[in-house]
Amino acid sequence: MRYYFSIILLFLLNSASQAQSGNNEWPLFRGKADLAGKVESEFPLSPKLLWSIKTGGTTKSSPVITDGTVFFGNDKGSLIAISTDGKILWKYESGASIDAAPMVYGKKVIFGSSDGILRAVDRTSGKLLWSYTTDNQIAGSANVWVAGNKAGIVAGSYDYFLHCVDPETGRSLWKVETENYINGTPAILNGKIVFGGCDGMLRVVDPLTGKQNDTIDIGVYIASSPALAHDFAYFGDYDGTKYCVNIRTRKIIWKIPGSDEGGSILGIPAVGNNSIVIGSEDKYLYCYNSSDGKLLWKYRTNGRIDGSAVLNSTKVLFTGMDGYVYILGLADGNKIWSFNAGTPISSSPAVIDGRFYILTQDGRLLAFGSN
C-alpha cells in the first residue's frame, strides 16, 4: 500500500509542477516549475511591437502573466501590475530592490527582494497579505510544489538556506541549509526540488519533508538554476561550463567547458525534445544535443547573454545585453527575426499564445504579437 501511495503522490507532484501554465498564462519564471522554458504554441511569424510602456526605475526582473495581467518588479522596490493592453493597474512598494521575476499562485503574487523578505500580495489589488523574513537578500524567483491539498512556496536566500513556506499564511514549513549563497530559482519536477548555489553543490530535496536526498559536487559556483527534463538537470556554472546531470544516479552525463573568451553562465537552458539552448556572457547562444552534449550550432551576438531563452518545436526566442530581441531557427541557429530595443536586456521572455513580453533594463515593458 505504501508503494502505491508513493506512486500516486509522485504523479500528483509531477502533474502539478507541469500544470502551472497554459497557452494564455505564464505565472512562473520560465513558465513552468521545471524551468525548462519550452512552449507548445507558435511564436508570431513576423512579430510586431504592439505597445511599450515606461514604468520607472531600472530592472533585472522578468515578467509573468496570468489572466490578462503582467507582473514584474524593479530596483526601486515596486511590484507593478500592467494589463496586457498596456495600462498600469497598481503598484506595490516594498522598499527594497526586486531583482527576479515574481510568481502567481492562486490569487496571490509572491516575490522576494533585497531586504530578504518574501511577500505575498493580492493579485487584483496589490494589498499585502503576508510576509516571511529570511536573514539575507533573496535574488532568485520563488517556485511552487503542489501535492493533493498540500503546497509549498520555495525560495533561496543569501542566508544559505532554501526556505519553504505555506502559500496561504507565509508560515515556515521547513528550510534546508547549504554552505553559501543561493542565487537562483529552485526547479521542481517528479517530486523533487533541485537547486544549486555558490557552494558549488547541486542539491535534491523532498518537497514534502525538506529532507535533502542527494548532493552532486560540481565544485564551481552555480549562479543560476537548473532546467529539468525526465531524470536530467541541465545548467551552467560561473566558469562557463555546461552540464547534464542524472539526478537519479547522481552521475554527470556530460560537461562542456566554457569558451576561450570566458564568460559565466547566468541564464537557464531551454530544453527541447533533443536539444538544449543556453546563452553565455561570452556573447554566444549555444545549442547542444541533450543526450551527449555535442555542439549543434552557436550564434554570436554583440553583448553578454544574461537571460534565458524560450523555445518551441522549431524556433528559439532570446534577449541580449546588446539590446536586441532575437528569434532563431532551432534546427540551424539561423536568424529569423530581430528587434533593436535600444537598451540592454537581461530579463527572460514571457510567452503566451500569439504574444511575448520583454522587459528592458531601463524599465520598459514591450509587447510583441502578429498585429
What are the residue ranges of the model-derived segments?
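Sec-dependent N-terminal signal peptides
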Residues: 4-13
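Beta-propeller domains
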Residues: 74-84
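Boundary at the C-terminal end of the N-terminal hydrophobic targeting segment
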Residues: 17-21
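Short loop/turn segments that connect beta-strands within beta-propeller blades
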Residues: 83-87, 122-125, 166-169, 206-210, ...
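Extracytoplasmic beta-rich repeat domains
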Residues: 22-23, 30-33, 45, 51-64, ...
